[in-house]
Amino acid sequence: HISMKAYNEETDTMLCESVLSKEEYFRKKKTMGADIASANYQQEPIDLKGRLYQKFSTYETRSNYIKIWNYTDTADTGADNLCSIVFGETEDHKAEVLDVLFTKEPMEKTETAHAEQIKNNQVNHVRIESNSGGRGFSRNSERIVKERGYRGAYYEPFHQSANKQSRILSNSALVENNVYFPSDWKIRWPEFYEAMTTYQREGKNKHDDAPDAVTGIVETLANDNQVRFIQY
């Protein structure tokens, strides 16, 4: 069985540009959704039953927040994405996602983008996984934020020692019921949306940056409040 993909991720080229251009492919992918495009053009059907997250909670209008947080998972390798999520903690200790930075850009660019994200969202508490280059990233982002006149953020780089895969799996129900995304999050952050909605419970996942950071949200709120989340 030969699998011929319309788009080659490694070379960033199309199988046959005259039949389907790269621009047209990405337009179709955005319109029909990554899962359908993947099945139609990449011969990679997504296993719907095998998805880790079977549902996502959404919100239309922002609540009142008792605190604005940021959770950042820096890229471990060149193939990884930096995933930085700003979320508001509601009075009943739910999380509403306000802003997402999800990129493969090099650290020298993302440090500035991260600092802007912290400043623009008036974040109170920044938690950054300090594994690999996270500690230096945290230091530089904090310096840039202060240079730009915002001093309201407390930076907390910390070492994440728990197993990533088991953290993601064991917290999936908490994520489904306690993390709320904007109703238009598919349009706002298409790559992040794709990473969350196609992540498989078992089998090979190329990347886990998005689920890792979202798992960090529920861990952060649980540790900060010592509250028991409702698991359905």
Task: List where the protein language model places each region.
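Extended C-terminal subregions enriched in glycine
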Residues: N124-S138
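Signature of the SF2 helicase/ATPase Hel1-core->accessory helical subdomain module
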Residues: H1-E10
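Nucleic-acid-processing active sites and adjacent nucleic-acid-binding tracks
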Residues: V86-I128
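C-terminal nuclease/phosphodiesterase catalytic domains that cleave nucleic-acid phosphodiester bonds
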Residues: D35, A39-E44, G78, I85, ...
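Flexible loop/turn segments at secondary-structure boundaries
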Residues: E10-T11, L48-K49, T77-A79, H93-K94, ...
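ATPase catalytic-site recognition across NTP-hydrolyzing enzymes
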Residues: E10-T72
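Gly/Thr-rich phosphate-binding beta-strand-loop-beta motif of the actin/hexokinase/Hsp70
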Residues: R62-E89, A213
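Short, glycine/acidic-enriched loop or turn micro-motifs at the edges of active sites
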Residues: T74-T77, F102, S132
